[in-house]
A protein has these predicted regions:
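Peripheral interaction segments used for macromolecular assembly
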Residues: 1-254
């Protein structure tokens, strides 16, 4: 299922033995555009720490208006005893090695796919040891969804709007779309751009470049936050841009 980051922000986080806080934001890598960590706001519990939860530990998402919670398949003690990272420190590879080693999870940077040896999160523990061996590793540069909000979208013939939100797939934790607000050009219009269609990102300039014209983007299927993102809508969107759906690519990869 697809969720926006803004929808998930503030959701309660339920560990196996109790509440650990609420969703603050997400960190994603800029190679595969996949969420690597949920950042928890733990209030007075574990002050001064960045409490990071990998998608390996994320369970079901309850969207019920009276619940709005995400299950975490960890105990509070496991989280408390995990490698600590100060709230003002970046997430280094050294920290990630310690973090993933502590939980004995497969390292996502060991392999060619978004989750190492697979394009999805492998839940079979018996296969994990195999995943941590021998595959080519790569450096991940983690970005914040909070910091990425507001980045300007540059078409091949000028500016077109800014990033309003990120849309996440809770099965693979891939960022499927950037929600682009174009109200400065066409009042009330919001459109979706897939990270697969991005030419490059200038993190210093806070700009996302796409090899599409403003006119092409202008006439793309309109997205509204209230609209349920169905596969039919996604198919229409990909067909408009003459692109193959990611779900077909992943079907082949499996």
């Amino acid at each position: 299922m697809l969720f926006t980051v803004k929808t998930l922000k503030g959701y309660k986080l339920d560990a196996i033995d109790g509440d650990v806080g609420r969703v603050k934001e997400f960190y994603f890598d800029d190679r595969h555009w996949t969420v690597r960590y949920l950042v928890a706001d733990t209030g007075c519990w574990l002050p001064g720490r960045q409490v990071l939860i990998s998608p390996y530990a994320l369970g079901s998402i309850n969207k019920d208006i009276y619940q709005q919670q995400i299950g975490i398949i960890l105990t509070k003690k496991q989280i408390q005893d995990s490698p600590s990272l100060n709230s003002d420190m970046p997430v280094s590879r050294q920290f990630e090695e310690s973090y993933y080693g502590y939980y004995s999870w497969p390292r996502y940077w060991s392999g060619t796919y978004s989750w190492g040896s697979h394009p999805y999160i492998e839940r079979d523990h018996e296969k994990w040891e195999k995943f941590n061996q021998d595959e080519k590793t790569w450096d991940a540069h983690l970005r914040s969804t909070h910091a990425g909000t507001g980045y300007h979208i540059q078409a091949n013939d000028g500016g077109i709007g800014h990033v309003e939100d990120f849309i996440i797939d809770d099965e693979t934790w891939a960022i499927r779309y950037l929600m682009v607000n174009t109200r400065n050009f066409w009042p009330g219009k919001a459109v979706l751009i897939s990270p697969q269609w991005i030419e490059r990102v200038s993190w210093g300039e806070r700009k996302v470049f796409v090899n599409l014209s403003r006119e092409t983007i202008k006439h793309s299927p309109q997205y509204t936050e209230e609209f349920l993102l169905t596969r039919d809508f996604e198919a229409e969107l990909h067909q408009y841009y003459h692109r193959q759906g990611y779900w077909l690519d992943e079907l082949v990869a499996k």
